[in-house]
Amino acid sequence: MILDTDYITKDGKPIIRIFKKENGEFKIELDPHFQPYIYALLKDDSAIEEIKAIKGERHGKTVRVLDAVKVRKKFLGREVEVWKLIFEHPQDVPAMRGKIREHPAVVDIYEYDIPFAKRYLIDKGLIPMEGDEELKLLAFDIETFYHEGDEFGKGEIIMISYADEEEARVITWKNIDLPYVDVVSNEREMIKRFVQVVKEKDPDVIITYNGDNFDLPYLIKRAEKLGVRLVLGRDKEHPEPKIQRMGDSFAVEIKGRIHFDLFPVVRRTINLPTYTLEAVYEAVLGKTKSKLGAEEIAAIWETEESMKKLAQYSMEDARATYELGKEFFPMEAELAKLIGQSVWDVSRSSTGNLVEWYLLRVAYARNELAPNKPDEEEYKRRLRTTYLGGYVKEPEKGLWENIIYLDFRSLYPSIIVTHNVSPDTLEKEGCKNYDVAPIVGYRFCKDFPGFIPSILGDLIAMRQDIKKKMKSTIDPIEKKMLDYRQRAIKLLANSILPNEWLPIIENGEIKFVKIGEFINSYMEKQKENVKTVENTEVLEVNNLFAFSFNKKIKESEVKKVKALIRHKYKGKAYEIQLSSGRKINITAGHSLFTVRNGEIKEVSGDGIKEGDLIVAPKKIKLNEKGVSINIPELISDLSEEETADIVMTISAKGRKNFFKGMLRTLRWMFGEENRRIRTFNRYLFHLEKLGLIKLLPRGYEVTDWERLKKYKQLYEKLAGSVKYNGNKREYLVMFNEIKDFISYFPQKELEEWKIGTLNGFRTNCILKVDEDFGKLLGYYVSEGYAGAQKNKTGGISYSVKLYNEDPNVLESMKNVAEKFFGKVRVDRNCVSISKKMAYLVMKCLCGALAENKRIPSVILTSPEPVRWSFLEAYFTGDGDIHPSKRFRLSTKSELLANQLVFLLNSLGISSVKIGFDSGVYRVYINEDLQFPQTSREKNTYYSNLIPKEILRDVFGKEFQKNMTFKKFKELVDSGKLNREKAKLLEFFINGDIVLDRVKSVKEKDYEGYVYDLSVEDNENFLVGFGLLYAHNSYYGYMGYPKARWYSKECAESVTAWGRHYIEMTIREIEEKFGFKVLYADSVSGESEIIIRQNGKIRFVKIKDLFSKVDYSIGEKEYCILEGVEALTLDDDGKLVWKPVPYVMRHRANKRMFRIWLTNSWYIDVTEDHSLIGYLNTSKTKTAKKIGERLKEVKPFELGKAVKSLICPNAPLKDENTKTSEIAVKFWELVGLIVGDGNWGGDSRWAEYYLGLSTGKDAEEIKQKLLEPLKTYGVISNYYPKNEKGDFNILAKSLVKFMKRHFKDEKGRRKIPEFMYELPVTYIEAFLRGLFSADGTVTIRKGVPEIRLTNIDADFLREVRKLLWIVGISNSIFAETTPNRYNGVSTGTYSKHLRIKNKWRFAERIGFLIERKQKRLLEHLKSARVKRNTIDFGFDLVHVKKVEEIPYEGYVYDIEVEETHRFFANNILVHNTDGFYATIPGEKPELIKKKAKEFLNYINSKLPGLLELEYEGFYLRGFFVTKKRYAVIDEEGRITTRGLEVVRRDWSEIAKETQAKVLEAILKEGSVEKAVEVVRDVVEKIAKYRVPLEKLVIHEQITRDLKDYKAIGPHVAIAKRLAARGIKVKPGTIISYIVLKGSGKISDRVILLTEYDPRKHKYDPDYYIENQVLPAVLRILEAFGYRKEDLRYQSSKQTGLDAWLKR
């Protein structure tokens, strides 16, 4: 039996060691022959010699590839040839892999990150733990003497206990007379004795409980201190335990023995409120063990009284650990055999890692190449696998009888196997049989077994076997299969040949491009951003949109392009021509769309045949808008030679000295001039008109600093270039001088300028595109000409000519031309516009020659009337009516032919055909247009017919011919066609797509690049000659690997099938068998949430977390997150970080509410989103479980049950980082400077000095900060500036630091984000300095009010973030009246940051200034401490008002594991397979019989391995919410969820009463009896008839006493003990009684051992109100009972008969 493997190095070579147990003996086998290797995929095999010649360095030694062997492997379902590169030593791999990967011939390298010893197990097919050897197990535990504040390992180990199958004993160094205790002379001898025990017993497995993090590291540290060699292993060279890092945690390895730490196994396996050894022992084995608190251990050891009790406690720890080890070890051994790795590894691995190791082993056995894990830059992202997208039925409340529980056996694995869900079967073309996933629509080939399903078939059987062996305690197979979502990546070879036309929207402009040229150009310009996967290149983009259609609603949509894709291709291509003249060239695997049975389906290139029907556009919807042309911008790309005589002018009226005055004003605004000009208001008014600033009653506010900066740059140029032209009373500037700054012109200002030639015609710079301009462009594109010729004087003459023979048309041409370009000349057959500006505009918009004419983008994006005007004018020039009465448009340009089809489709004209004859493209239109109309009946085109094949598929009968829409309606209305089936074809009439028949398919060979787009959501785009819809490659996770084996499509499909089968089963059991199923929610995008990403705290808008759509379920879109944790609140009231697997968004179609906390602090939530309110009362009840006071509440419920919401109020990061005193002073100074200092600027002084104003506190600041910092060299010197307390501080480095980090580009003060990562002490120091400079302490009603006031709300928001990080609750509000200076309004408004947690602020931050700190502390002494959330991680904030607000756009939510809560805008909010059923009123026997009949029925309908199982029958049960219910089975066993009171801070009387209530309801079916039980207990408590031991409350000390800022009852007792010299360490359980009396509860609690019935009386009100009633109301509230109904003296209560369903 193999226990473990590792390797050692001898003579520079690795030797594998196999630790084994064979025939009862331990042995180590060696294998020196195994060599490390990786795989490399090469573009060209001839480069292999270059690869072998690559050199690397390891520890000063040159290393290289020893040998290379070419091998054939399978990779994600296809054959590949790779090179196996062999090395001398495993450490050569990390030294060489980067160099090899960088070689240009290397596509990628694989399997380079598999540890050498694990690789050996996989390759050799060795399975740890296989065999029948009997393993010896030994458990041990230590007790330590820990003094408060001691470092880890400082206190002595006072006892070591151990246990095996034979005995349980204790070793100690104080005399204890017990048969199982061995006494030695001191701690050193005790450790040596334990080492001897391990040697003598020679266990194969050493069991600990949290030994990785406590027992063994502590033992190692003490052994080192005492000079004892801790020989616990069987490796003679290295027998000491070794601490290894495993991710973020540590693990201890004992070579030759398996160190089995129960703690991570238990945490992974079972769900408990607390994981102490006592709690786990009782929960798993149903046994109890003695408990000792820290104060008792300390007292016993120091006084040496009750030493036997301590020894028994220690011995029981070891025995409990051993018994739990016996229970859990066989499960982990089975798991190790399945995975093929050691128990040491498996027991400490996450579920995801276990899956991966299993797949690696199977992949090797099947000759599959494993995909790579992500590197640091490409994080592995995981789908949450519990219920995402699954079916949830809200429970039926009330008490029910005779309930069956049905569950699917291995639901997800069964789905995977049944439907062959695997990356290599996903959407595989050419298969005969497919299974299609519901909702998501992915297809899985059934012609061959997929990689994953073929593995899972055996696993499902294994899982059943392991499940039996593990007694249902752990189910690793099911867990791993639920984690299947991390499987595979697949790159689809769906591609288009390069010369296909593609309409694309780039930066808002519609362009028609050749797909190959376009993608090549983008990739060439952004080489550094192109990612290569195998031979596929992917470029992510964010400025492109494509024309697409929605497959569900069959409507045209504009969708974002996520990526451009190309790859080299050699193989078959197909030229597909449709009857309309459309055509496209695609590869064999690329899909177009067809319709089958009324549904849109993909059909691949090699599957398309003549006569097939293909989806084409009927109407293309555009994002229409009013359009204008910026002529200077339009011509700015022309050469300087072409625009040499172009000028821009503006009227001089009202602009005297304007340009220089504006420049001086702008310079003053940017701080570059000290004095503002006298007439600056003139320029401020102009800037406000442009939208660059906002004028206030006094002063102004810049609305867009970036635009203002560019405007200043423009005027720097204009002021030096503009000239006054007195002849025309205008200012003039040569276009070429300012062409580089044209984009900096605000359009509103440009509207006042004109542009033209120096001595000729000028037109407005901004030209509005209306119907007349559309008509002018239509004339020009059809029969226009733009030319430039040399004239007689040697110059250039420019003209635009519009040709036509019809005088009426010439008159129309003349009118529209003169409207825009002034006087024109009309000749016999043309209109001549002899203006250079007309020439430039037409050339830039539409092209000059017939071959390159185009419809400009401004027409395609204009409103429909403008497009119609263009089309009418074009038809007048290049259109005619064919003898068949069809309209015909002609052009020599292929581009223009495609644009004309696009234009027609955008106007809803779909009866279009395209022809080509004698070098001319003809576009035929077979329907009436708005302008010319014909009365002759036209032939009906494909776009107005429903093909007979489609009719046959839908209605199941033959039709003789295609059917017109009119005829179709008649037959449906008359009932001759089934109306329900007809609905499948409504899209032909109302939708935006039509079907076009394939005329021919030509197969050809192609070699070269092929291209594709990744289009968001719809996964298709418009492409090809004449334009048709093609399926795109899915890109997102599919672009490049994020993990080994990952497939979003597979994950979604499994979930969708799971939902489908659960819904189907519930529907069938209710509709056909008469059962009733009893059991089976967002914020706005601007909401800021607190996250921790890769260890760093960030404050981000929730919408910024949503980077892309990874998948959709219904209308909800999901973005998978990796490495992201959210700040949340657990049920103990503590702030914790929990993983966020995804962020979700959907369009807001609900009411939105704004919850105001102050007039400047709010949160926006939808009507159904839950906030977390706090159930407050007039009394503080610190013993009550906080989680029960956290109530989900909708916005409109605020102010009723809940008046307070929750904000953070505890540090967000550890406070144990080492800090230095001088660094603290440095950050205090920085805070002072930010608050009351000045720095930066262009003066010489500002390069070396900072200014600081300290006022009357100058001497104090000097002594506390400036002198020490000068002594340490942080500042060079400081000089008093005046008698007002101002200093000049000489510190060049500090000046640079402040400039770089504490001012933004606009010169405003800011707080850099790196401060979030500083130690808490330094952040507090900064805040201390800042509040000392700018903070105030005022007294209101005797209570100090701490504020920080500023007019910059952004700055205060940053300060708030720092306060949240250090754990100080705060709020912000704004003044409603403007500030005044010398009696005059300044136009600014003060914002106040107000400290809520004044006590923590005073203790942790406070003020540097003694007078402020003294004032604060003096008034805090008499102020009342808020008790309602004392000692917890949150504070309360009251709702000011709730109002409904208008909102359009996305709303967001995140999934937070375990708590399902997160802080949005610093307010806590909620984020949002089997089933129970009954037949009301029926007898149990009939219900069971019917259930079994249903199982036979449903299992006959379920495909493959899917099977519904009968899991149990329950006599009675009630369901409160979907996570709170209780049922009782036929043997009287009660199962509860979400109702238990199992925490220590519930007294025994509360637990006991709740249990009796459950028994009364479930066993006797009487809610009235339950109520009587409660009243009886309440009466006994009130009359002091309850035994004292039932009133004891147990609470744990969780941290050092000095870290408790608020004093709860257990902390109060612990501090009293500490004051008496009794040491209390974290982990100590305090057991106390609450006494009757007045005052705080923490003053009225005593230890149970101190209670004297002659002197003391417990507080009955406390136990009734805070213990018993809350515990039972968890149940009885569901039946309509309230607190007042349950007191024994109350009147008769109403019953629950209405709830009991008979």
From Swiss-Prot:
Xref: PROSITE patterns: INTEIN_C_TER, INTEIN_ENDONUCLEASE, INTEIN_N_TER
Modification note: This protein undergoes a protein self splicing that involves a post-translational excision of the two intervening regions (inteins) followed by peptide ligation.
DOD-type homing endonuclease domain span: 776-909, 1229-1368
One Pfam family, short name: DNA_pol_B
Gene3D superfamilies: DNA polymerase family B, C-terminal domain, DNA Polymerase, chain B, domain 1, Hedgehog/Intein (Hint) domain, Homing endonucleases, Intein homing endonuclease, domain III, Intein homing endonuclease, domain IV, Palm domain of DNA polymerase, Ribonuclease H-like superfamily/Ribonuclease H
SUPFAM superfamilies: DNA/RNA polymerases, Hedgehog/intein (Hint) domain, Homing endonucleases, Ribonuclease H-like
Keyword Repeat: yes
EC number: 2.7.7.7, 3.1.-.-
Catalytic activity: DNA(n) + a 2'-deoxyribonucleoside 5'-triphosphate = DNA(n+1) + diphosphate
Keyword presence, Lipoprotein: no
GO biological process: DNA-templated DNA replication; intein-mediated protein splicing; intron homing
UniProt xrefs under InterPro entries: DNA-dir_DNA_pol_B (IPR006172), DNA-dir_DNA_pol_B_exonuc (IPR006133), DNA-dir_DNA_pol_B_multi_dom (IPR006134), DNA/RNA_pol_sf (IPR043502), DNA_pol_B_thumb (IPR042087), DNA_pol_palm_dom_sf (IPR023211), DNA_pol_type-B (IPR050240), Hint_dom_C (IPR003586)
Top-level taxon in the UniProt lineage: Archaea
Entry keyword set: Autocatalytic cleavage, DNA replication, DNA-binding, DNA-directed DNA polymerase, Endonuclease, Hydrolase, Intron homing, Nuclease, Nucleotidyltransferase, Protein splicing, Repeat, Transferase
Biotechnology comment: Used in the PCR method because of its high thermostability and low error rate. Sold by New England Biolabs.
Gene Ontology MF terms in the entry: DNA binding; DNA-directed DNA polymerase activity; endonuclease activity; nucleotide binding
Signal sequence extent: none
Family membership: Belongs to the DNA polymerase type-B family.
NCBIfam families documented for this protein: intein_Cterm (TIGR01443), intein_Nterm (TIGR01445), pol2 (TIGR00592)
Function comment: In addition to polymerase activity, this DNA polymerase exhibits 3' to 5' exonuclease activity. Intein encoded endonucleases are thought to mediate intein mobility by site-specific recombination initiated by endonuclease cleavage at the 'homing site' in gene that lack the intein.
Name under which the protein is recorded: DNA polymerase
Organism of provenance: Thermococcus litoralis
Organism classification: Archaea, Methanobacteriati, Methanobacteriota, Thermococci, Thermococcales
